A protein has these predicted regions:
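Acyl-donor-binding surface of acyltransferase catalytic domains
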Residues: 1-28
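Conserved acetyl-CoA-binding loop of GNAT-fold acetyltransferases
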Residues: 4, 158-168
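A short beta-loop-alpha structural element at the N-terminal edge
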Residues: 31-43
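Hydrophobic adenine-recognition pocket in adenosine-nucleotide-binding enzymes
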Residues: 35, 111-113, 147
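A conserved beta-strand-loop-helix scaffold within acyl/acetyltransferase catalytic domains
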Residues: 47-112
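Conserved acetyl-CoA-binding loop-helix of GNAT-fold acetyltransferases
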Residues: 110-113, 119-136, 156-160
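Conserved GNAT acetyl-CoA-binding A-motif
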Residues: 134-147
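Conserved beta-strand-loop-alpha-helix junction that forms the acyl-donor binding cleft
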Residues: 144-155, 171-182
Length: 198
């Protein structure tokens, strides 16, 4: 669940020991399915339900931009959904690529679980599935993700998978110089640590 009561700052987390991660399975009644043509609305509905977008239509636009238009990767192989026993699509995540670190690197992207299905280990099962997909595609040694302060419960999950918060002083955002990035990142990490009571 996104906590909109606190300020939003972006965070980056990365992992180098990509062969080591916990193994979680979906609870009974849920199954993994991959994207197929026409599923953009399902993705957008999930993301809108968790407040990623103000409207489903905006979510569809972002899906097409991020996963369909001018993309060398296949959404059918990399965009994951979770479906419940009624056939409803209730969660999604993707293994994609990104260039925050200056070169094309694999990333966990757009993780979301509908609030009605939260607390059941679905996000953890998706993380295990995506790490296994990462390895099956022949990648090794580095993977990252972006998240934000309002998603601090997710930060704790990612840490259990060995992801670490980026704390270096080199900016990974094009709109911030190193000094501004460092100040913002320190504020963000302090806020997350406060919310996680550590």
């Amino acid at each position: 669940m996104i906590d909109t009561s606190i300020p939003y700052y972006p965070l980056i987390m990365s992992k180098t020991d990509t062969d080591i991660y916990p193994k979680h399975s979906l609870p009974n009644g849920y199954e993994f399915v991959f994207y197929k043509e026409g599923d953009a609305r399902k993705w957008a509905e999930i993301q809108t339900a968790v407040c990623s977008f103000g409207s489903v239509e905006r979510g569809i636009e972002v899906f097409i931009r991020d996963f369909i238009e001018n993309q060398p990767l296949s959404a059918e192989e990399r965009v994951l959904f979770v479906r419940d026993e009624k056939g409803e699509y209730i969660a999604t995540a993707a293994l994609w690529d990104g260039d925050h670190f200056g070169s094309r690197e694999q990333r966990i992207h757009w993780v979301a679980v509908h609030d009605a299905h939260g607390g059941k280990g679905i996000a953890k099962a998706m993380m295990t599935c995506l790490m296994e997909l990462y390895r099956s595609l022949g990648y090794n040694g580095f993977i990252y993700l972006t998240t934000g302060t309002r998603n601090y419960p997710a930060v704790a999950i990612y840490e259990r998978f060995g992801f670490k918060l980026y704390e270096e002083t080199k900016s990974l955002f094009t709109d911030l110089d190193d000094e501004a990035f460092t100040k913002q990142n320190e504020t963000a990490i302090k806020l997350v640590n406060t919310m996680l009571k550590r």
